[in-house]
Amino acid sequence: MVSFLICLALLIGGYFVYGKVVENTFGPDDRETPAVKINDGVDYVVLPQWKLFMIQLLNIAGLGPIFGAMQGALWGPIVFLWITFGTIFAGAVHDYFSGMMSERNNGASISEISGIYLGGFMKNVMRVFSVVLLIMVGTVFAVGPAGLIVTLFKNGGSTGIVTTTLFWLIIVLVYYFIATFISIDKIIGKIYPIFGICLIVMAVGVAVGIFVKPEYTIPEIWDHFGSMHPKGTPVWSFMFITVACGAISGFHSTQSPLMARCMKSEKQGRFVFYGAMVSEGVIALVWAAAGCALYEVTGGLNTGLAEILANGQSAAIYDVCVKTMGKVGVALAMLGVIACPITSGDTAFRSARLVLSDWFKIDQKKWKNRLLLCVPVLGVGAVLGVGNALGFIDYTVIWRYFSWTNQTLAMIVLWAASMYLYYEKKNYWITAVPATFMSAVSATYFRLGNECLGQFINHKTAEGVTVYNTAVAYPIGIAVAVLFLGIFLYTIKKRHTQPHYETLGK
């Protein structure tokens, strides 16, 4: 429990200390923000700072810091270190610069930002990559909640249309269309802060429940510094890929421009972007602690946690909430596993619309132009979702690549931020170091992960245990990271001029 409290204190202190260092490095000033300068009444709308924070928190969080943290807890309390230091030195830095670089470039999407600082090829790669990723995220967060609602009705003894996934999927997709189409302050600006508060209350309730109930004890890092994973899965780099939301996640860079278009002052950036990521880190720390504390540890392995997660991640959330908060926990759990994914799904589709609008220079003030992009974006999501509900389409194979692509996206954004800081003649090491680290993570996982090259190289024992060839993968990961750092240092020696700043037709 002591190590948990130390990590919690470090996270909070990190916001005030290192967050200030990051802010001073960027150098916010009193220039006119896109929300004030453009103010189209749709995507560029000035919102109060507290709403910006709550919306950003819910955009980047959803159930990510809960699911990911509990999966990460399979490795034991060592995951506390990744959540804490990953958030302070990588995730919050990533979120801050993805938001503030966007703000400095008229609220540009992350694909356009990547193009400005990493070149035209990377821009086009990121455009396609971002749209595909966002539509996939939006679709998954439509199908998942629809299935959970069906389960609730079936468990309550209901029959008929309300027990069909297709019925609820259509309702969720209709809501997504409305939220993607209308002004950001009409739905997202009004209900997101409420759900953001619920997400925080749920984490506080779980934390209090662990502390006040004597049967639960959070294990110490120094007592379980090695891996406690029941399947013997290596800490490096699997834990760093599994725990994305709650440490560092490339998906956040697609969401930060939404709030960059709604800020009244650049000086709100630290609270909105860095602060929201630290808050997500705290939430992840609480849920990781719950995963370590509530379930049986056998022979130094988290076997009890593995068993509850085998019943489904939603079941695990429900179980934790009930054990720590009783009947109140049931209501919060249902709200969490249904509302939180939906609030991530609608902004994923909204971000996809904005990426396309920046790509094809389509002004979004006119409703016809928004409709022009909303229809195909939601149409693809509907085809995937309905096809999956009817058993015609199985996109889970593609979705398995999300974990790796998510962290690779974070790596790319950090390298873009490093180039930005170089051009601004500022300390680029605060982004280049985590960029190098994430390059090693992504490269190592690409060699080890069963979704990637691991499916051709890893082998299983007679007992079905996967054996990972870490002796080859680890040096490869380090070599790739050193190579990328070398390319970056070589590039900044050759470049002496500022990149072309695009206005994106705004």
Residue positions per predicted region:
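Helix-loop-helix module between adjacent transmembrane segments
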Residues: 10-11, 15, 56, 90-106, ...
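Hydrophobic alpha-helical segments and their helix-loop junctions in multi-pass secondary transporters
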Residues: 138-156, 164-168, 180, 199-226, ...
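Membrane-interface "cap" regions at the ends of multi-pass membrane proteins
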Residues: 10-66, 268
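Membrane-interface loop-to-helix entry segments
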Residues: 5, 9-27, 129, 145-149, ...
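Loop-to-transmembrane helix boundary motifs in multi-pass membrane proteins
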Residues: 123-127, 162-170, 275-284, 292, ...
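Extracellular loop-to-transmembrane helix junctions
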Residues: 1-19, 72-102, 111, 122, ...
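Hydrophobic, membrane-embedded alpha-helices of multi-pass small-molecule transporters
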Residues: 48-64, 207-215, 224-287, 332-344
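Extracellular/periplasmic helix-exit of transmembrane alpha-helices
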Residues: 99, 209-221, 275-319, 386-393
